[in-house]
């Protein structure tokens, strides 16, 4: 969880125990979810999860680097790094200090967000990081009563952005109260993830 000032991954997986270290404090051990997913997050190091993190960029970048270098990840087949939005210190540190195979950009339908996505794509290109695909979150709402689709944040523009940059749109995820409920209650692993098949295909291609 590289979103240092707004970590949410532990809560999504119901992880509340603080991480442990070896005897001399040089190695940290990640927490493990019910299904065996290893998680490292600043919230797993803090006394209270609601305490603010008021750090400058270089300190935040240093913590992100520590999460990669000073955590015993053991044998890991695939690692996901959740970055905050934008092109700041965190993604820059991730791109420079980790062996990144590619990134998935997550966006939403608003015009303003599309501009930020373009910045992220251009940053990846400048640093020779492959963009595996784009995901549009909160793309639409499907009425459970009538089945009609409503575009709460306006019609999707993700396909235009993807085509302009020769990138695949790998998923358009609807607004779903059930998803929000499971994540808020720490049960992310109980989600029906069939809507994410396109993302998995892009990663494994």
Predicted regions and their residues:
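Phosphate-binding loop that captures ATP/GTP phosphates
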Residues: 4-46, 61
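Conserved beta-strand segments of the P-loop GTPase G domain that flank and frequently precede/overlap
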Residues: 41, 105-108, 134-135
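C-terminal lobe/tail of nucleotide-utilizing enzymes
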Residues: 121-205
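Residue-level signature of catalytic and energy-coupling elements of molecular machines
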Residues: 9, 40, 64, 82, ...
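Glycine-rich phosphate-binding loops of nucleotide-dependent enzymes
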Residues: 40, 83, 96, 132, ...
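Conserved Switch II/interswitch segment of TRAFAC-class P-loop GTPases
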Residues: 74-81, 87-88, 99-120
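Conserved nucleotide-binding/hydrolysis micro-motifs of P-loop NTPases
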Residues: 4-6, 45-47, 85-87, 109-113, ...
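Phosphate-binding/switch loop-helix module in NTP-utilizing enzymes
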Residues: 46-94
């Amino acid at each position: 969880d590289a979103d240092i000032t707004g970590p949410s991954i532990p809560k999504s997986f119901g992880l509340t125990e603080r991480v442990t270290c070896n005897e001399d404090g040089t190695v940290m051990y990640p927490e493990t979810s019910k299904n065996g997913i290893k998680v490292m997050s600043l919230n797993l190091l803090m006394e209270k999860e609601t305490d603010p993190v008021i750090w400058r960029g270089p300190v935040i970048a240093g913590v992100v680097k520590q999460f990669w270098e000073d955590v015993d990840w053991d044998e890991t087949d695939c690692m996901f790094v959740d970055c905050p939005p934008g092109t700041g210190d965190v993604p820059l540190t991730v791109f420079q200090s980790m062996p990144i195979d590619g990134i998935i950009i997550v966006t939403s339908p608003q015009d303003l967000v599309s501009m930020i996505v373009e910045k992220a794509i251009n940053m990846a290109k400048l640093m020779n990081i492959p963009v595996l695909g784009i995901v549009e979150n909160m793309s639409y709402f499907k009425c459970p009563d009538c089945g009609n689709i409503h575009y709460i944040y306006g019609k999707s523009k993700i396909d235009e952005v993807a085509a302009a940059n020769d990138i695949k749109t790998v998923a358009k995820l609807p607004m779903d109260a059930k998803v929000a409920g499971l994540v808020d209650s720490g049960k992310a692993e109980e989600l029906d993830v069939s809507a994410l098949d396109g993302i998995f295909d892009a990663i494994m291609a």
